[in-house]
Amino acid sequence: MAQLVYLCFRDNTLSEPFSNLIDMKYDHQIKVSKPSFKLPEFEKVKQLIEICNELKRTYKKEPNGGSPQLFHLALEQLRVLNRIYENRTNWMTELLYQSGEQLYAIANKLDEIQNKLDGPEDTGDGDEEESYLIQAGRVMHMTLNICFKDRNERVDENRKIGVFYIGTLLFKLYNRIKAYGLLNNMCKVFESHFNEIGPYLSRINNDLIVIRFKFYMGLYYGYEKNNYALGFKWLQETFDICTLYESIPSTYKVRSQVLIYLIPMRILHLRHYPRLAPLRRTYPSVAKIYTMLVKSLCTGNLKLYEKFIEDNEFYLVKRNLYVTVLKMKELVELKLVKKAWILNGGNTKVPLDMLAKAFQISRGTPCHVTENVAPNHDQELDELECILATLISKNYIKGYLSHSHRVMMTSKTPFPGLAKPLER
């Protein structure tokens, strides 16, 4: 069995026996023997085999995966693999990913156990030990650096393909421990090196890796950099890959997760609103979240929009959707102005008093029958002018404001189409 592992180094190919060696759940240990050929890394490989054997023995005793000893063995397994990987080509990449996934699962399990012991009220005294996931992330980051630093000109051998494998593991890990600063920094690294590493993305034959990478890059561009075009691009590509597996019931949760973030990007970038009836049939959980928002956008109902924000504030903040959804308010206001303009007969001269009443009705606030009844009437009109000025400055409305006459002058066709075609 050991000879089959050694042959992987001679032939630069990954075989099933080597993968089985790394897998702690595969209950078969290997006896170390001398290789039948010269193997420069023999001492390191010997050490790796011994660690893997001990890892399997420990797991067999504690199959629930909640042992600190198991964690330290898995951590050392990845460290030794890193030392071997530094002098090898990318044939070992999936092996390191396998080891990293295994390490993540053990660390996550131990952190969950520790969190239950600490309790929700335990804030720590500043002397607590690092979490297992943080320790695991540090070693995974070493793997990532090994991948990034490869200067091999042969694309089929270069370790840079590994940045996507290990990078997605780190994305998942940072997201789990809510280290959003580290997650965003990682995305910045990928962004700055994408011309260099981009060609390797198409060479990955594991769609799960591609889905994870594109998803987190979509979140980074769309929700951190407010680049809705790139956010939409990455998330749409993620969803397109996910739909290839829609016949598999277990993928429904993943597709729903992607849609939750894709819909706001589609609205803000393309001005395309989801059709609620098909959405309710196919993704009822997603439709439940966005029905109120979509209705407010389509009708210009500010009261409904505010209710959506109020009812879902905690959820939106937790999912990092809050700021993005707030930016949709001007689209609700635009729809309301358009409806008021139509009710005004499409005249190019639109009194601000009339628009102010439309806003009051839409917000569900008392509507004053006569002008200047309310003591804050001028203030309301000033606030309305600010809203209209913003819409005009963004070319959502073709027109201008006359502050002295309290009117908005528009062109004959003041509302240019904002929807963009979907490019494939």
From Swiss-Prot:
List localization entries. Answer: Cytoplasm; Nucleus
Reply yes or no: does the keyword Cytoplasm apply. Answer: yes
Q: Any idea which UniProt keywords this protein has?
A: Cytoplasm, Nucleus, Signalosome
What the entry lists under Gene3D superfamilies is as follows: Winged helix-like DNA-binding domain superfamily/Winged helix DNA-binding domain
Recorded protein name is COP9 signalosome complex subunit 12
UniProt record similarity statement: Belongs to the CSN12 family.
Q: Which GO terms describe its molecular function?
A: double-stranded DNA binding; RNA binding
Subunit structure of this chain's protein: Component of a COP9 signalosome-like (CSN) complex.
Query: Do you know which Pfam families this protein is assigned to?
Result: PCI (PF01399)
The organism encoding this protein is: Kluyveromyces lactis (strain ATCC 8585 / CBS 2359 / DSM 70799 / NBRC 1267 / NRRL Y-1140 / WM37)
Protein task: Component of the COP9 signalosome (CSN) complex that acts as an regulator of the ubiquitin (Ubl) conjugation pathway by mediating the deneddylation of the cullin subunit of SCF-type E3 ubiquitin-protein ligase complexes. The CSN complex is involved in the regulation of the mating pheromone response.
Residue ranges constituting the PCI domain according to the UniProt record: 224-415
- So which residues are the signal peptide here? none
The organism's place on the tree of life at top rank: Eukaryota
Identify the GO cellular component terms for this protein: COP9 signalosome; cytoplasm
